[in-house]
Amino acid sequence: EILAPFLKDDGKLTLAQFRHNDGSLKEERSIFWARVSERLMQRLTEQSDYFGEVANIELDPPLLSPPQHEQFDMVLTFRNAHIWNESGHLYGTLQSIFQALKPGGVLGMVEHRSARLSDISSSAVEGYLDEAYVIAAAERAGFQLLQSSEINANPKDTKDYPKGVYALPPTLAMGLTDRDYYLAIGESDRMTLKFTKPARAAAD
């Protein structure tokens, strides 16, 4: 709703969609996200006057399909890294993104931030990721950190809830239990990171 109209007349937006369900998906979570992608693609078609021409590729972590080689000036990802990490594909997905970016291109990342500063990763239960861990994974994939911001920080997020980050809005996984408490905290504390693919580097 923001990027598509902004790029409609001067640029091009490509969405990395969840894997299409061709009947082979068995995992409930994958089937759910395939439906989300289908609804989004239908909306883009129905409201093409507003969104313009939006391209679609598939991201089935860690791979983009079709493979992308130095195609993009910028890649943005919002609260996806913990999902990639939980399936063991954080580093591999970052490698695919690195390959897809043009030299000098930018990766922007927003992610739920854990309270720790260490080399540990996230667990599927909590949904948070350690900022140092994310930066290290991106640098290992070839990126250089340009800047970090506290624009999405939330000091009220204590990160110790029974269902992890999913207890907070918008998910509110605890249902009616302590709902007002979680609404008062608001959405999660998040890292906001800006990386670049060095101009001298070329994708393999």
Describe each region flagged by the PLM:
Residues 108-124:
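Short, glycine-/aromatic-enriched active-site segment of Class I SAM-dependent methyltransferases
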